[in-house]
Amino acid sequence: MTNVDIFYLVLGLALIAWAGRWAYRRHHYRSAMAQPFPDAWQQMLITRLPVYERLPAALKQELQAHIQHFLYTKQFVGCNGQDITDEVRVVIAAEACLLILNRASTRYKNLRWIYVYPSTFIAKREQQDAYGVVSESKTHMLGESWSNGRVILAWDSVERGMYNFSDGRNVVLHEFAHQLDQEDGAADGAPLLYTRDSYQIWAQVFSQEFTQLQAKLARGGNSLIDSYGATNPAEFFAVVTELFYERPAQMRKRHPELFKALQGYYRLDPEAWQKP
């Protein structure tokens, strides 16, 4: 047997092994997705995430399928002693998957890991001043989204958000909005849209609303949109996503064009889920 024969033999065996692993994973995935949504998870969502009960039946069923896919394809990691229980996994998955309901979605294809801390965590940042001097700063964080497939969350902040789904603040919605924004690269406040024309309309509406928020805050005024949204366009998108899902009636009334743009992107009307 020549070296060429050996090369092709090894290559063939490697391809057979790869195909076997792929077929096994596909079969295992299909089997997992065919399982009924566990009653324990359903009860968990009813008691821990009140908005779940108010979803229409079709959206509730779709959310369950997204949750199962999410939990099968993403890995949770506990940090600083945080236990990764079914409650932690299911609640985070449910809130994250609210953002991908009722529309064609990649299901966070770039996301691999969710790191969960018990409470606020410290993020270290290197910054360079005008003279080129590099220093390190430390910031207490509730959550963070990275473009390399990672989301970091503080569990106590997640809990506050899931029980109070009407204050316009939700760390899971915020960080996973960043994930959607990062699907086309760095977070810039413009996620992947459906048509080429959509980008022009999006840019017009968001630029105007972002500028108005900054101007209002500079004058010392109050805004329905949290002041953190004035940081940059990426944070603006994440902040108004929280508002869209949690305070849709107020947003529709005070920021109708912004609400319309977000409704066109998320293809939902969360006002239908609000308490009567």
Which ranges hold each PLM region?
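Short, charged/polar micro-motifs that form catalytic or ligand-binding hotspots
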Residues: 49, 53, 78, 82, ...
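N-terminal low-structure segments adjacent to metalloprotease catalytic domains
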Residues: 1-119, 185-201, 205, 248, ...
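Active-site recognition of the HExxH zinc-binding catalytic motif
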Residues: 56, 167-183, 238
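Metalloprotease/metallohydrolase-associated module, dominated by Zn2+-dependent proteases
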Residues: 91-108, 113, 117-166, 186-276
